[in-house]
Amino acid sequence: MTRKAVETAMQVCPVEIAVAVLGGAWKLTIVKNLIDGPCRFGELGRRVGPVSARVLTRQLRELEADGIVSRTVFAEVPPRVEYELTELGRTLEPAVAWLDDWGATYSSRLTERS
């Protein structure tokens, strides 16, 4: 089932679809941190930065609903849950790398101006 925000964006243009899927708080940082492979919730939270467990959970659920992230629950005691990029999610790697480079360039230019 497609989320309402994505359905609405589909009526506008592809850029709006990308923003609807990836524009949430911390979503691109989550994707960036899953590029290296599967990760458990706690570790992902530490890698992402100052994000609350509630927000991280919500963003992971939306990314899962949009087919970008998969969630695997292992039948172990204690339970183990891992998140990883789906095949579709992996297609974001070049875009995320480009945005990461752009962000670093932008940040250095702001620093130079101050």
Predicted features and spans:
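Amphipathic alpha-helical dimerization/coiled-coil segments
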Residues: 1-3, 10, 14, 32, ...
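Basic amphipathic alpha-helical segments that dock to polyanions
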Residues: 56, 60-66
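Basic, gly/Ser/Thr/Pro-rich low-complexity segments located predominantly at protein N termini
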Residues: 28-29, 42, 58, 72, ...
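Generic structural signal for secondary-structure transition and capping sites
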Residues: 27, 39, 65-68, 101-104, ...
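N-terminal helix-turn-helix DNA-binding core of bacterial DNA-binding proteins
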Residues: 6-55, 76-77, 82, 90, ...
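Intrinsic disorder/low-complexity segments enriched in polar/small residues
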Residues: 5, 60, 83-85
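Beta-hairpin "wing" of winged helix-turn-helix
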Residues: 64-84
